[in-house]
């Protein structure tokens, strides 16, 4: 991917503005998950070690533009960065018109979404951001799908614009998994609705050899194949779309394997009785809440034969133990596989954490919406802007 990399630049004495994704959950001033802060540290350390005057900004929450809000302030992030880096990290509240920072120093610039014009990618604001630095570094993959002043406009205006190590690692992994995958490529797509992942399914079916579905998505595909699904979650208005996706897969020799057995209950509640049934034995008041053991074994065998695996979404209601076995079997199969594996999406990350397999997945994307849009085959605005500047 043709993008100027921060690690290839001479940064000594340069003013470097880094856009990170430090949008961490905060409860009563306490950071409850510092994963994104930890992920940002290598980029910051490289810039400091190379003698740059480093400025970092990020969004946090959804503040009203032009209004400072303590609830959405990066103050807790500045404090935690100071502790992790072992240096003072001052927080600058009013920074758009200029920042004092010396080589070897780091300042955190207050929540960029508080700046008027940020969300609509205002050119005047983007130019002010660009004027702050000699080098702008985009390192926030999680916001690369948003064309905003700090993620897109400034890339177009800055003297030099580069991709940071975190962003480039994400793009390199996604490119390896989707744009230039070693075949066979298998994708797992779970979730409640076909409608939210329709573009994803339509794009993947043109690239994969196997497309495993789970959750409400699988129920819609079962209904499209003529099976009764009782009162299970599905989308009746997308049955024809599901049939078209199945037809498209068959036309290029790909397969969308359907469950042969499922785990059902009469109510969607923890502690209810779970029953394994074949898919042709579903009755009117059944709720399908997981794939069955026979299906899980079959899917695990398919994963074992894949050279590349892309995973987005669980295949059952894994939050309830009675309906978690399918997702667990697949998670462990992906972990045990010799394939290059990429996983992303909030529920997927929660499943990976639950089963303790994070260190056995080749790459775990923290990108959320950006990860999904990349899987859909969309061009991410920040990435497109960086590519345009590389020429």
From Swiss-Prot:
It is an enzyme of class 2 (transferase). SUPFAM superfamilies: Phosphoglycerate kinase. It is found in: Cytoplasm. GO terms for biological process: gluconeogenesis; glycolytic process. Its EC number is 2.7.2.3. InterPro entries: Phosphoglycerate_kinase, Phosphoglycerate_kinase_CS, Phosphoglycerate_kinase_N, Phosphoglycerate_kinase_sf. It holds the Pfam family PGK. ATP binds at residues 197, 319, 345-348. It catalyses: (2R)-3-phosphoglycerate + ATP = (2R)-3-phospho-glyceroyl phosphate + ADP. Substrate binds at residues 21-23, 36, 59-62, 113, 146. The keyword Cytoplasm applies. It comes from the Bacteria. Pathway: Carbohydrate degradation; glycolysis; pyruvate from D-glyceraldehyde 3-phosphate: step 2/5. Keywords: ATP-binding, Cytoplasm, Glycolysis, Kinase, Nucleotide-binding, Transferase. Its main location: cytoplasm. GO terms for molecular function: ADP binding; ATP binding; phosphoglycerate kinase activity. GO terms for cellular component: cytosol. Gene3D superfamilies: Phosphoglycerate kinase, N-terminal domain. Monomer. Belongs to the phosphoglycerate kinase family. This is Phosphoglycerate kinase. It comes from Xylella fastidiosa (strain 9a5c).
